[in-house]
């Protein structure tokens, strides 16, 4: 999978050089390409923002550097999905992560300030498949944190990135429910014991217990995930 990121803070994504995604990059499973938005400016101040038409607080990111950055991202004509993090977008879910993990090319545009000039989104939509995506009903200082979260969720679903694919099946949201509690050794710690069923060796009973724990936890914490 190829992933392009456009940002005024490309160094923010240095963390992608470590852990599972770092190994995925080294092995060629993920081809990450960072684009510094300021590299597409042509004034000595490397300006990427300006005051909004119509007035209002804050600054808006100018279309010119964004247009040139997207020209570079889209130059290979690979028909990527271009994602702009936005509180006005559709909410990112595990199902969306699974869907996007099958795409050969994703591109992310990290907005800042009061956002990106809408013409950038509109023009990009004439050249690629554009999606506005939100992490939830709150506002961040910029798109970098949201993009990091999405890449982490999507990248680990790319075949070969996670060593044991079975672990992906057992996680929260993989089947629409929250994950069951997990335990390891020792069998007792500070007066708290591992549930007997998990030490019984009865795989049917263990599966039933885990399923019930998923349902109970989902009913208690995220009842909105359960069917009506």
Curated annotation (Swiss-Prot):
UniProt keyword Cytoplasm, yes or no: yes
Subcellular location per UniProt equals: Cytoplasm
Q: Provide the top EC class.
A: transferase
Specify the domain of life of the species encoding this protein: Bacteria
Q: Identify the NCBIfam families for this entry.
A: PRK00026.1, trmD
- Subunit structure of this entry? Homodimer.
Write down what this protein is called: tRNA (guanine-N(1)-)-methyltransferase
Which organism does this sequence originate in?
A: Clavibacter sepedonicus (Clavibacter michiganensis subsp. sepedonicus)
Kindly list the organism's lineage. Bacteria, Bacillati, Actinomycetota, Actinomycetes, Micrococcales
């Amino acid at each position: 999978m190829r992933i392009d990121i456009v940002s005024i803070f490309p160094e923010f994504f240095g963390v992608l050089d470590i852990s599972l995604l770092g190994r995925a990059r080294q092995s060629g499973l993920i081809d990450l390409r960072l684009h510094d938005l300021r590299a597409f400016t042509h004034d000595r101040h490397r300006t990427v923002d300006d005051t909004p038409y119509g007035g209002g607080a804050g600054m808006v990111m100018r279309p010119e550097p964004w247009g040139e950055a997207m020209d570079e991202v889209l130059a290979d004509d690979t028909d990527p999905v271009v994602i702009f993090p936005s509180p006005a977008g559709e909410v990112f879910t595990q199902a969306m992560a699974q869907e996007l993990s099958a795409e050969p090319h994703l591109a992310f545009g990290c907005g800042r300030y009061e956002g990106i000039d809408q013409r950038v989104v509109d023009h990009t939509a004439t050249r690629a498949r554009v999606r506005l995506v939100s992490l939830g009903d709150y506002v961040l200082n910029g798109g970098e944190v949201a993009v990091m979260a999405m890449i982490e969720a999507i990248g680990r679903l790319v075949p070969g990135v996670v060593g044991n694919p079975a672990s992906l099946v057992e996680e929260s949201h993989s089947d629409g429910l929250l994950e069951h509690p997990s335990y390891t050794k020792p069998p007792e710690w500070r007066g708290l014991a591992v549930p007997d069923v998990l030490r019984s060796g009865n795989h049917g009973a263990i599966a039933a217990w885990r399923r019930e724990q998923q349902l109970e936890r989902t009913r208690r914490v995220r009842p909105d995930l359960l069917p009506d």
